[in-house]
């Protein structure tokens, strides 16, 4: 089963974005730093990451988790999805693949 694991918003001003989601929206802040902030939202994580030239402010990345990443990758490619990164072991120790959805949002998929 495909599960929504996280949503990352790329932000132009980390402090302003943290204040908005913490003080206005009311999400409990789990962690805050200059390069990453994270909120408690139940089973799904909301993360804030500094914007860059590639990931401009307001752009969103969606994170999915699947039980079998290689099988998911093969199924999605058979349906015409073009991956920007095939399944690859990451520095943090997890396996990850990436593609863009029909609207241009980045989607990262983790799994075994």
Give, region by region, the residue ranges found by the protein language model.
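Alpha-helical segments within the soluble intracellular
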Residues: 22-23, 40, 77
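Amphipathic alpha-helical segments
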Residues: 13-28
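Conserved short beta-strand elements that form part of the metal-binding/catalytic scaffold
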Residues: 28-60, 106-111
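N-terminal beta-strand motif that seeds the catalytic metal site of vicinal oxygen chelate
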Residues: 1-16, 45, 60-62
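Helix N-cap motif at beta-to-alpha junctions
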Residues: 13-14, 67-69
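Vicinal oxygen chelate
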Residues: 73-74, 79-112
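Short secondary-structure junctions
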Residues: 26-31, 84-86
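Short amphipathic alpha-helices within nucleic acid-binding modules
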Residues: 20, 58, 70-75
């Amino acid at each position: 089963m495909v599960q929504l694991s996280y949503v990352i918003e790329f932000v132009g001003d980390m402090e302003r974005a943290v204040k908005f989601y913490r003080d206005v929206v009311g999400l409990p802040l789990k962690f805050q730093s200059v390069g990453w902030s994270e909120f408690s939202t139940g089973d799904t994580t909301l993360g804030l990451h500094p914007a860059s030239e590639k990931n401009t402010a307001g752009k969103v990345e969606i994170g999915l988790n699947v039980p079998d990443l290689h099988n998911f990758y093969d199924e999605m490619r058979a349906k015409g999805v073009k991956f920007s990164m095939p399944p690859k072991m990451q520095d943090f120790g997890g396996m990850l693949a990436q593609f863009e959805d029909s609207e241009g949002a980045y989607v990262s998929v983790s799994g075994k």
